[in-house]
């Protein structure tokens, strides 16, 4: 089965899927294509490079004098009640967003604008997919909004069903390691604020005994996870930039009839969540395509 486009094809597979599809089509970094035995149809060295993401550091604090979702989810009976509350009244914990509180902050006074984003949840767990803790706790997740580290994503082989190889290279730059350590210190400062004193926060992760810069950086690597904001693997740029994949009209450089309209075209990651900027990119792509079609 095949499908042909009369005018244009628009790739919107995201910062992971788009470079993967390009490489499977023979478009990309010659050495990456050679590694999987894919003939080079169009060389573009920037495909799959420049991967950026927001690494979240999940600090956890045990609390007292208040219930959290950790407690309620230990009971099958209460789980059933939460389900019924949602089904019949569309209310309760199952209506909650992934985070119930967010804030922007600076890791140090050296930054002119906020370089951190916090997400706070009334629950905790050791790792995603594992059960919630049996003790009451809150999670203060903090991410570096402007990481300096860069990674890459490339096809693992010619099989389109095989997952691509993703190397984010988190904390590979000294600046990111410094911000990570300062972020944990700031999370501790927030937990120690007078307003939270009645709840007696006690640090569970990464551990109050970790105080040196080296220990905090190591802990950041252990408690850090993606916040699911991958971008920039098919970045927009000028013709003078050899790593640019698309031009200012989102057209794949050197090809006709192919555009990209997703988070992969961002030259740099945004200082906040990536969903709304991606919607803007899609709307702009539609506007550009309509304008070009009228020429």
Which functions belong to the PLM regions below?
Residues 1-82:
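Glycine-rich loop(s) and the adjacent beta-strand/alpha-helix scaffold that form part
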